[in-house]
Amino acid sequence: RLVGSEMCIRDRSKYKIMTPGPVQVPENVRLARSLSTTNADLDPQFFDEYKETCELISELLHTKNETLILSGEGILGLEAACASMTEPGDRVLILDNGIYGAGFADFVSMYGGIPVMYTKDYKNAFDVDELDAYLKEDHDFKYATVVHCDTPSGMLNDIHKICPLLKSYGIMTVTDSVSGMFGNEVNVDKAQIDILCGGSQKAVSAPPGLTFVTISDEAKKAMENRKT
């Protein structure tokens, strides 16, 4: 609030943020953000720093896939992935056992795709054998969406079993690991994940506003071969 010509700023240093995100930002990170910056598009050094940071994220996620950092909260990566992968009429399998799992259907529909819901109890992780039985009956999907950790419930799905199973049926994967990566092990290459999305405001313990996306060569090819 404003008092006269002076702004009164409440001291929040005594508070501890215990929400699942945005999380408490460490003091050294907060201080680093207070340093002077340049215009990224005019600073040649920024491109080297950006590339190095992307490579470090790839290393942490155990992948040779390209990593990009986007300016926006984690949900930006989820929509960007669906927007880039979906063409009108594409059937997309939505693995739904949580709020964010179900939310993928909206993104797919927005870009003309046909979301096919595979819905399970929100209190239980996906059973890989049950999913396999389902896929034996219907696996005609361009890609599938899966949430690693669904933030509201804390539901943790085993992406290291789910994604390889989907790949065995020729189905690419878009994986939401916004609240999973760096808090739980993620080995992108071992799990054969095509697109993995994360965010800065969860286990990275940074402020909100950045999205991390890793993209496989197969996913890039699908994007390049779009007809629309």
Residue spans of the language-model regions?
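Single conserved hydrophobic/aromatic residue that forms the stacking wall/gate
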Residues: 1-9
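A glycine-/small-polar-enriched, mobile loop at the entrance of the PLP active site in fold-type I
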Residues: 14-71, 75
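The feature marks the mature, well-folded catalytic cores of soluble enzymes
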Residues: 12-15, 88
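Conserved PLP-enzyme active-site core in the AAT-like
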Residues: 19, 23, 28, 52, ...
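A generic structural signal for short, non-catalytic loop/turn and secondary-structure boundary residues
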Residues: 10-12, 62, 206
